[in-house]
Amino acid sequence: MEAATLPPVFRQEKAPRTRKGVELMEAHIEDLCREYGIELAGSSARGRAIRWRGGKLEISIPPIRGQVSYFIALHEVGHLVGKGRSAPRLESEANAWLFALENSAVEPTSATKRSISRRLEGYLAWARNRQHRRVPPRIPPRDHPFWALLQLS
């Protein structure tokens, strides 16, 4: 089985945006929410995405103060509209991070990549600690991008 690799994921814009820094990242999240019909429902330190019955989409995200909180917001949007939303937990988390990387308006810093990797390591530890259960969480196959995302740091 071949090891997982990530395609080049940073989205290069054809025309550079005029906004910079946090203002650019906030505007990008607002644009995505408008585009996909997602309601920003307050603040959450860790981020949360909810798909309500009737089709209402909602995210709670931390205030965007820098890249890590921006990528958390993109990740939550990815849970609602990205590919692989209904995959098992670890794969769904990886898929949401892939959405964040593919749709970001800024190139991720090494600190952002470390943050993504650490968060996925936490989910992997969670899954490994529950392998004794009657229905254990599924650990992704070796060729899933989950494993390449773990190597970002």
Report the location of each language-model feature.
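A short, surface-exposed helix-loop junction/capping segment
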Residues: 5-16
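Long, well-structured alpha-helical subdomains associated
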Residues: 10, 21, 65, 106-153
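Active-site scaffold of zinc-dependent metalloenzymes
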Residues: 14-15, 19-22, 30-67, 80-83
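Short alpha-helical catalytic segment bearing the HExxH-like zincin motif
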Residues: 68-76
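An active-site-proximal "capping" alpha-helix that borders the catalytic cofactor pocket
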Residues: 90-106
